[in-house]
Amino acid sequence: MDSIHPFIYDLIVVGAGHAGCEAAHAAARMGCRTLLLTIDLDKLAHMSCNPSIGGPAKGHLVREIDALGGLMGRVTDRTFIQIRLLNESKGPAVQAPRAQADKRLYAKVMKETLETTPNLDLRQAMIERILLPQPPGRNGSAAPADDPAGVQPGHYAVITHTRRVYQSRALVLTTGTFLRGRAITGEAIWGAGRAGEAPATALGEDLAALGFPLVRLKTGTPPRIDARTIDFSQTSVQQGSPTPLFFGHYYRVLGEIPPEPAFTGAPACAYPEPLRAAWRPQLPCYLVHTTPEFHEIVRRNLDRAPLFSGIIEGVGPRYCPSIEDKIVRFADKERHGLFLEPEGWSTHEVYVQGCNTSLPEDVQWAMLRSIPALRRVELMRAGYAIEYDALATGEIAADMSSRRIPGLFFAGQINGTTGYEEAAAQGLMAGINAARFIQGKPPIILRRDEAYIGVLIDDLITKEIREPYRMFTSRAEHRLLLRTDNADLRLTRLAGELGLVDRERVEAVERKREESERLLRVLRGQRLFPSAATNARLSDVGIAPLSSEMSAEDVLRRPEVRYEQLRQALDLPACDADIAEQVEIEAKYGGYLQKQQREVERLRRMEARRIPPDFDFTALRGLRNEARQTLQRFRPATVGQAARLAGINPADVAILIVALERRGRRDMALDVRSGA
């Protein structure tokens, strides 16, 4: 840090949740002097809700974050207590790893990582006010009279609760649920960013005063119970993966030894003997179900439920409803599954997945004790709802920046999303593009066909966000191209160009790409005939005999055939497991992959049609009023973005294209005349 100006940075990141940590780390890796500010350094990267990372779509995001040099996957690999591959019986597009992390250990390892990152400073402070960059006045002064003296022209300034002023050339806000947050359990309401932590009320009011339209959103969390009061004999056990599984690509492509777990002691004694897998100790999770008595207790107390009494004003996530909402909406369903998830190796706290609630605490005790395995359960923390401010739709651009103010970036729940993974992905891109802004370089914008991160951000800027947004595989129309197994092939080359990963890792990924392509060429070129000798060799490894001539690739297309079987039968080259996986997927799904790739090429032509930033959509003749208003509000940067806006039909797109072509011809004519 500059010793003459100790409080002046290239970039300031406000908030050290999952978005803020990734943003600060990325910018610092890219050479920017970065300051990460948080209300409580002991809660940095705190997992304030569930202890899980990953799952369908979310696991895809984590693999992409890792491929781009982010931290979430690496930290999870060192701190998980269990990991599984979900949707293993389905196709590769929807398979994804999901881990249960040790919540306190995750935060500890993340903090240690950030503390040792060059160019990055961590400070504990609550930000109460933001000063926007001011150009030099006519008399050379940089700031209005009521602002602190010494703020440099073109710099942001943030003022802390202790009146300390920090300055920077760009600013990233990752405020989570803290903006004017309030927590609710029954009739109890108190100001909080999350339980036990003060809200950022002054900052929320300051953003509103700066003219940012804000909406009120809501999320919830379930009770935490004491493992010592659970009858585990009446639960169904869910074990972790029996074979090595990680989020990180690094150990596969570099041949590194997988990361050592950060915890090496014994688990809390309340848990039954954990699975001692040969590759990594893991703790099981446990499944229980609600009962008719549970449902009756909830229904009997709906008049005390803030969700139905009008106390809660914010809109909650549709796909993560509270238990009282599920019982009302799905009245015909006799039971709901609840997963009991340990929050760490050395704690007795257990997270009740699927039981988000803001019912009064006495009701929470009663309903949980109606479940046989929980007859004597004791709550360690009651569930609660949290309401908070978020930006209204249309405030951010594709590079995560404000549409109003250059150099201001937003990431995480302030943009209307929910989930650790969604926040981390946005934070990574906000940090990258804030650094690019500081360096005077164009932004990095991932397309929908390049990454789930691209789908996420594109949805945020082209769709009306009326409730907290959660990522699903169904949101990605090119999901067969965006698998967890090829995230490094899609994104690590870009990460190397940005300085987020070292050359050794990029070269290793390129070797993986080249080896996969080479093996596919070998398979396509090797012709097999249905001779007795060939069929005998195939039969020896469990492959059905041939009835006609075909290539080795054709044999591998059979659903039940694996590359290792074929290698043994045909003396094919040996390869690493991840390369074999790539070869199998390319062989089995080649036709579908080619079809999706053709569709991508068609859509890319629409994305290539740029819309000038100053384009006046209100002046478009022949456009419906609804379309005109939608385009003017969202201000899409490309024809492709415009086509994805709700309420925009093909006729509207055709009118827009004609208008752009007309403007292009006019601008070209003006250039010719001015040149003459």
UniProtKB/Swiss-Prot annotation:
Keywords: Cytoplasm, FAD, Flavoprotein, NAD, tRNA processing. One of its GO terms (molecular function) is flavin adenine dinucleotide binding. SUPFAM superfamilies: FAD/NAD(P)-binding domain. It is found in: Cytoplasm. GO terms for biological process: tRNA methylation; tRNA wobble uridine modification. InterPro entries: FAD/NAD-bd_sf, GIDA_C_N, MnmG, MnmG-rel, MnmG-rel_CS, MnmG_C, MnmG_C_subdom, MnmG_C_subdom_sf. Its cofactor is FAD. Gene3D superfamilies: FAD/NAD(P)-binding domain (3.50.50.60), GidA associated domain, C-terminal subdomain (1.10.150.570), tRNA uridine 5-carboxymethylaminomethyl modification enzyme MnmG/GidA (1.10.10.1800). FAD binds at G15, A16, G17, H18, A19, G20. NAD(+) binds at residues 316-330. GO terms for cellular component: cytosol. It holds the Pfam family SAM_GIDA_C. HAMAP family: MnmG_GidA. Homodimer. Heterotetramer of two MnmE and two MnmG subunits. Belongs to the MnmG family. NAD-binding protein involved in the addition of a carboxymethylaminomethyl (cmnm) group at the wobble position (U34) of certain tRNAs, forming tRNA-cmnm(5)s(2)U34. This is tRNA uridine 5-carboxymethylaminomethyl modification enzyme MnmG.
